């Protein structure tokens, strides 16, 4: 009976270790693949601060895609008007 809990604990521990070892390395500044160089550590933090300043500025986005008018939208509008007319006639 004692071997099963030990075996389960070993499997869980092995899984956690393998997951941690196979994960991707992220360097300073959250950019993948870079080397950690202590000489340039201050530069990377300053760059992160500049990126935050740029993110703080509001950005205006415009939709450049023009979708053709959908026939289903026209049908929906016609059905809504028909329902409103019928409801108006029933009230009278």
Curated annotation (Swiss-Prot):
Upper taxonomic lineage: Eukaryota, Metazoa, Chordata, Craniata, Vertebrata
One Pfam family it belongs to: GnRH
Main location: secreted
Site description Cleavage, residues in chain: 26-31, 33-34
Keywords: Amidation, Cleavage on pair of basic residues, Hormone, Pyrrolidone carboxylic acid, Secreted, Signal
UniProt record similarity statement: Belongs to the GnRH family.
Any GO CC annotation of this UniProt entry: extracellular space
Tissue specificity remark: Central nervous system.
Site, as annotated: Appears to be essential for biological activity: 26
Name of the protein: Progonadoliberin-1
Signal peptide start-end: 1-23
Purpose: Stimulates the secretion of gonadotropins; it stimulates the secretion of both luteinizing and follicle-stimulating hormones.
Subcellular localization, as worded in the UniProt entry: Secreted
Chain positions with Pyrrolidone carboxylic acid modification: 24
One GO process term, biological-process aspect: regulation of ovarian follicle development
GO molecular function list: gonadotropin hormone-releasing hormone activity; gonadotropin-releasing hormone receptor binding
Residues recorded with modification Glycine amide: 33
Source species of the chain: Rattus norvegicus (Rat)
């Amino acid at each position: 009976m004692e071997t099963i809990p030990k075996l389960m604990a070993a499997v869980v521990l092995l899984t956690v270790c393998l997951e941690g070892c196979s994960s991707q390395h992220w360097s300073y500044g959250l950019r993948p693949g870079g080397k950690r160089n202590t000489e340039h550590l201050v530069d990377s933090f300053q760059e992160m601060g500049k990126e935050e300043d740029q993110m703080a500025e509001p950005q205006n986005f415009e939709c450049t895609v023009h979708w053709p008018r959908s026939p289903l939208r026209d049908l929906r509008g016609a059905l809504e008007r028909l329902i409103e007319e019928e409801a108006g006639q029933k009230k009278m």
